[in-house]
């Protein structure tokens, strides 16, 4: 029952990502959008399965796999917004953010510093934040706000025919 919504959302994201690749091809915007969609789809799909398992060992595996994807979501959104805004000078910051997410991924996989177990609720297992989790929250706040800011500034300064792409990207997030 509690897995229906994450499974549905997962399917929608996967469909969007594949649709864009099939219709737009492998462009910088299309690839970055598809990475965002596929990452979101697999994260939501993992949570849909997580809410159905009853084995703690399977639950911790799914939690770590799901969080591995969550770590890269803010950066993939930032990457997409950087491409939509046509800001190649931002790419080094995007790569830096991917690097930070990769470092956090090492801690996630190799220790309990990022996710320190799980809570068991009536609807299933859910991750328990570890000591390093606030770093991810801070990264999320910084890169999402930066992405929204550059998209807003690009839209504000764009020719009216080019501004529509930036405007349509903002409400999606």
Question: What does each model-identified segment do?
Answer:
Residues 1-14, 24-146, 170-173:
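Individual alpha-helical transmembrane segments in multi-pass integral membrane proteins
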Residues 144-154:
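Hydrophobic, aromatic-rich transmembrane alpha-helices
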């Amino acid at each position: 029952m509690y897995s229906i919504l994450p499974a549905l959302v997962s399917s929608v994201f996967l469909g969007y990502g594949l649709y864009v690749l099939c219709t737009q091809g492998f462009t910088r915007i299309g690839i970055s959008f598809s990475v965002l969609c596929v990452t979101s789809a697999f994260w939501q799909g993992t949570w849909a399965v997580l809410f159905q398992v009853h084995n703690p060992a399977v639950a911790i595996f799914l939690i770590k796999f799901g969080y591995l994807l969550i770590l890269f979501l803010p950066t993939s959104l930032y990457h997409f917004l950087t491409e939509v805004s046509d800001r190649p000078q931002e790419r080094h910051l995007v790569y830096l953010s991917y690097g930070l997410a990769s470092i956090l991924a090492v801690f996630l996989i190799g220790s309990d510093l990022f996710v320190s177990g799980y809570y068991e609720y009536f609807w299933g297992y859910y991750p328990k934040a570890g000591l390093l989790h606030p770093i991810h929250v801070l990264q999320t706040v910084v890169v999402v706000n930066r992405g929204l800011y550059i998209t807003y500034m690009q839209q504000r300064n764009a020719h009216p025919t080019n501004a529509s792409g930036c405007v349509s990207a903002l409400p999606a997030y």
